[in-house]
Every structure is written in structure tokens, then in C-alpha cells.
Amino acid sequence: VSTLRWFAILALWLLPLSRADVRACLCDVARPETMAARECSLCRDVEAMPAEPQTVFVRDTNPNKPNRWLALPRFHGKSPQQLLDMTAPERTAYWSAAIAKGREVWGDEWGIAMNGLEKRTQCHAHIHIGKLLEGSENDHFVVVDGPADIPVPRDGDGLWVHPAGDKLHVHTDEPAGELKLLR
């Protein structure tokens, strides 16, 4: 029983380390010494790529997500990077590129998601692209005509988007929208 008790204490002590939360991100491309942190790896990846196109696509390196792509903007804002730091034309181009990649890979079964800051493991803004899981739809969404109409998430919030006929359903206030996508 004593060993079990110590294991429980250790697990509780380590629990905060298992949380994904980039609200205190320090990644700054102008200060190379800040870029060594694990949560800065997508920033480093983007900096190592050609300046064009403005959105680049990489496979998710998490071995538990073999079916996922990530859309990375060339944009570097303040840390942690959020969509609200981008201009409306930058956001529209970014959403459009992610949706196009989703359609290319998954046809009409695509879904895209951006996790909230408390659930993100990377400081660099990124959109998860995957196949929408069956049964994911819920009643908490807004209908928009296209990428230009996708609302900007409130500070730190996440969202997920999928096709609905010739419109899009945007599910807001979703901390971990990527869970609606095939891993």
C-alpha cells in the first residue's frame, strides 16, 4: 500500500507537467536563444522553409496522429501566436489554404481545427487538418459562407470547421477541436 501511495503522490506532482498550455510562450524569432524550447519547434520549422507560399503544410509528427496534416502560416506574431494577431486578408488566405488541403486529402469529409491556448503544445499558430469523425456534429455552431466569414476566436479560444453543403459550420469555444478529427 505504501508503494501505491507514493506512486499516487508522484502522479499528482507530475500532473501539471502533462498539460498542454502555451499561454506563457517565450518563442521569439528575433531572439534565437528563445527558440530552443520544445514548444517553439513549429516556429523553427517555418523559419527553415522558403518564404513562399505563405501557408506551408507538414505532417503531424505525433505518432498517434498518422492521418493528420498541420497548416502553418509564415506569419510570426507575438507569443503565443493567435489568429487575432493576423490581418483579415491573412486569416482568409490561411483558412482557405487549410480548407483546400482538407478537400484535397479527404474530399467532402474534411475537418479543420485550431485548439485553444490551454490545449496547444506549440506556440506557433497551426491548424489541424483531418477527416471529420462521424457523429462529431453538435448544436453549438455558426453557419458561414466561406473562409472570409470564419469568426476570429476570442483570445485563447479554439474552434473547428467542417463543410455543410455549400456552407461551413464553425464550432466556436472549443478548447480541443482537434479531437473531432481522425487521429
Walk through the language-model features, giving the residues of each.
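Bacterial N-terminal signal peptides that target proteins for export
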Residues: 1-7
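Bacterial N-terminal signal peptides
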Residues: 7-16
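HIT superfamily nucleotide-processing domains
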Residues: 18-183
